[in-house]
């Protein structure tokens, strides 16, 4: 990702995709920043994954997280200007992968301690970060800060 900066200082604010200025510490910025963290953790998982299919699935999920982050970084009134959005097809594809993977690997019924492999630990890290992002997004919906998800 190319870094963009103006060298003028931002006084603690950032721009949404439509240009609206919001605090960097605001709940919307926290939500899409959390998705960025999740994508980075999944990037580590992808880089250390042995199977090409695993790398393909993780990359696709990372791209979906970028779409979701873009939706979170867009004010509802600006959403019609952009074509990106997650659809039921994205969710269906994810559910299909889950079913396929569960058919290959039996899930344990008890809690697990992450860390058997670097890739597995990175996936667990990404999973927990995504769950945090979900909680933040639900808060945005409940506060009526977002409506385009």
Where do the model's predicted regions map?
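Phosphate/pyrophosphate-binding loop motifs in nucleotide- or prenyl diphosphate-using proteins
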Residues: 1-149
């Amino acid at each position: 990702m190319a870094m963009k900066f103006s060298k003028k200082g931002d006084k603690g604010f950032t721009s949404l995709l439509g240009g609206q200025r919001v605090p960097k510490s605001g709940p919307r910025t926290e939500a899409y920043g959390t998705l960025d963290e999740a994508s980075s953790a999944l990037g580590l998982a992808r880089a250390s994954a042995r199977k090409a299919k695993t790398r393909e699935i993780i990359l696709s999920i990372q791209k979906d997280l970028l779409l979701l982050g873009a939706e979170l970084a867009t004010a509802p009134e600006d959403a019609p200007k952009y074509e990106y959005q997650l659809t039921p097809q994205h969710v269906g594809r994810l559910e299909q992968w889950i079913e396929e993977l569960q058919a290959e690997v039996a899930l344990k019924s008890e809690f697990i301690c992450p860390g058997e492999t670097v890739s597995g630990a990175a996936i667990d890290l990404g999973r927990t970060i995504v769950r945090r992002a979900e909680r933040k997004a639900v808060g945005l919906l409940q506060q009526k800060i977002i409506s385009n998800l």
